[in-house]
Amino acid sequence: MTTGMRMVWTLNGHGWANCTVEDQQAKVEVTASYVTNAPEEFLTAVARLVFGEAETRAQFEAEPTTFRWIFYRQGDDAWIRLLRLRRGSDHDNKGTEIWSSQLHVDALARAVIRCFDEVAWTYDESVYRGKWGEHFPRTELEAVRRLWNAHLQGDDT
């Protein structure tokens, strides 16, 4: 199991973002389009995992490629699979795994919070909206932070 993960979300044109994720084993960059609520969906999946769900998912549409994040949790351990698919409606088994990692759920939450805090700091929320085309996912980010803090205090409610 790896001890850490790093994630970077970079806006690179109106409605487009690159998301780089890495651990000690590998690094991969995927693309997201604003045609879906990629950051909100991603943050919601992480929040649900931190809350205690055994499996959650998020999907980035890169037109025409789709990147599917699959999160699993057992106890305090998380396993992440990132798949590349031709279409968003394709079954997981039609995808190619391009990155995976096992880490403590705290390391996942910390990396995701740090990533989106950095996005808010770098772009400012109004600039983010202008570049991405949608509001910054403040509500979803704060949900991850609140659930992670509750998890750290031993109150998984």
What is the role of each PLM region?
Residues 1-39:
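N-terminal "first-domain core" detector
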Residues 21-23, 60-62, 84:
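Short acidic, glycine-rich loop/turn motifs
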Residues 5-9, 65-73:
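Broad, structure-driven detector of short, well-ordered beta-strand segments within folded domains
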Residues 12-17, 52-53, 74-77:
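A short, compositionally biased
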Residues 6, 32, 59, 137-138:
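Alpha-helical interaction segments
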Residues 70-157:
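Long protein-protein interaction modules used by eukaryotic assembly/scaffold proteins
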Residues 31-70:
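Short, well-structured hydrophobic secondary-structure segments
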Residues 22, 32-34, 43-45, 71-75, ...:
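Surface-exposed beta-strand edges and their flanking turn/coil or helix-capping segments
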